Amino acid sequence: MSPDALLVSAQRAGWQPPDSLTAVLLPAAQARPVYRALDPGTLVLDDLPDATGVLLVPDADRSHLLRQLSGRTAVVGPARPWTHASASYARAVRARLLSPDIRDTEGHLPELVLSADADAFADLRARALAPLRALPAATAGRLEGTLRAWLLHQGRRDEVAAALFVHPQTVRYRMAQLRELFPDLASPDRVLELTLAVGLRPS
């Protein structure tokens, strides 16, 4: 249905559409109690077959909404134009599948992007980290962790050491190993590929 057709339907129903809607997923039993504390224009779905409740909150002040949901098992999607509220709902669903600990999807965009195509991500990891495959699993794991910290801390050895709880000399030794395994480690294309490959820890 086109946005114009949706608007006509909303007007016929006597509903004034907001500029945006934010989807909130939470247990169905919590939907009504939370709804009573929110904007009265909030739409409630609490009769879905999987016992999930959905709130569609109009023009939400995100920080206020998150405070209102404190202590609740809730996932908050992004604000979207009301005609695209399904996109907010879809992201909240994906976030909940990714981790039960996610509350605000806006705080987990890198994980959501990297997990959007699990098959492509697995292929990327396999290709990018192929030089580690010949090593014992424990060694490969240590080197991958070091590589991840080195990339995320932009090669600052003391910060890498602090992140890994090791001595800076240990980082120096491991990075020497990694440079042998990845001779093109200074290549921007290689850095991008490796950063993506190690950016999300595999489940």
Per-region residue spans from a language model:
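Cytosolic nucleotide-utilizing catalytic cores of signal-transduction proteins
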Residues: 2-203
